[in-house]
Amino acid sequence: MARATPGMSGADLANLVNEAALFAVRRGSKQVERIDFENARDRVVMGARRESLVLSAEEKRATAIHEGGHAILTVVLPNSDPLHKVTILPRGMALGVTWSLPEERHTYSKEYFDDMICRAMGGRVAEKIVFGHLNSGAANDLEQATSIARRMVRELSLIHISEPTRPY
């Protein structure tokens, strides 16, 4: 559980324990079990399941292809964190989620960030390969990749941008 909750504060962990207790009560159990903690962690980290959201078969397929693209790259990229879970059940504001568990490290290589950008774009690439076009569902992935690249340039100096040469 500790590995699946990196960066959580004491208050975040207390909230997670309370959520786990609620899941146990809903199951009719007097004991909080591992499954309750896993469900609570998913709810806290990925958002509540949106069971009322009904997707068409086409939307479900597109979401599966998209999340599959993220998952494949998470597994094959050499500097990627290990894949933990993939779901096409809508959670929070997302139609699907691919979740990796970050390994504990104190420094990150340029290659690690490069792979993060590739993973973020994996859903878009999968959609383009399978459907031949993109849809609006990947907008957050583009924002994430842009944010990582911007951080690599502005804060970490991992990419050097030179002035464009002028012909005059």
Which stretches of residues belong to each language-model region?
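A short helix-loop-helix "switch/interaction" segment in the helical subdomain of ASCE P-loop NTPases
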Residues: 1-12
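Short "domain-exit" segments at the C-terminal end of structured domains
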Residues: 163-168
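Conserved P-loop NTPase/AAA+ ATPase motor core
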Residues: 11-158, 162
